[in-house]
Each structure stands twice: as C-alpha cells, then as structure tokens.
Amino acid sequence: LGHHLNDVIETTVMGMFYGAQIQGMMPKLHSTNFEGMELIRPLYRINEKDIISWCKYNSLEFIRCACRFTENDESSHENISKRKEIKDLIAELKKINPNIEKNIFNSIHTANFDTLPGYKIFGEEHTFLDYYYGDKNDRSI
C-alpha cells in the first residue's frame, strides 16, 4: 500500500480528534478480507515531501488516488476533507514545534499503558481496574 509517514501521523491525530481514540497505522498486517494475505506499507517511514521530490527528480507523475477521502477541490471549502484540515493544522503546529510530526509518530510507538485508564487489544476492551486490585507485579496485557 502507498501509505507514507504523513498518513500515519494524520491518521493518529484524526483518531484522537474525530474518533475519540488513540490509534495508529500498522506497517504490516494480515488482511481481514483475504485469508493468508499480508498488507505491507513500504513507505511507512518515508515523508510525503521526500516522495514528491523523488518523483519530480525522476519525472514521474502520480496516478489519481482510489481513496475518495483524499479527493478535494481546493477552490471549494465544502469539499476540503478532514485529513486536509489535520494536515494544515500539523503544518501550523510545526511552526511552534518543529519536532511535532516526529513526536506524534513516536507517541504511537512508545505508548505507556501504565498511564492509560483504558485500552483495547485484539478487539477486547480493558481498564486499569483489570489489574488495579490484583497482583501488582502482573502487568500483562
């Protein structure tokens, strides 16, 4: 799949702002639709600007994205997607903190479950109360 670093960052922020959850995007996962198939995102750690620069340098053109959520008409404010809004917000935040993208990306790779009151793993929801009254040494998820 063609998802890149900025897609991962934007998805993380969108999940928090619009989905009320902390979520990321996996670099590799098993398909839920096709048994035995793996989905791989080889551009997972590559910045969108670097991809665009590389394409320009090699005189390559992008094909139209099949994802309807990325389509928007810049001249019409009604058609600007939530992802575009998040992209613009991150660009503004980057002026204040140049490391904002790196920090958002790293935050989903260093989640501290000890400080989260709730989490979901493999579709099963848990709360801090699952281990709060039990064995303090048993912190397994």
Predicted feature descriptions by range:
Residues G24, N97-E101, T115-Y119:
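Secondary-structure transition/capping residues
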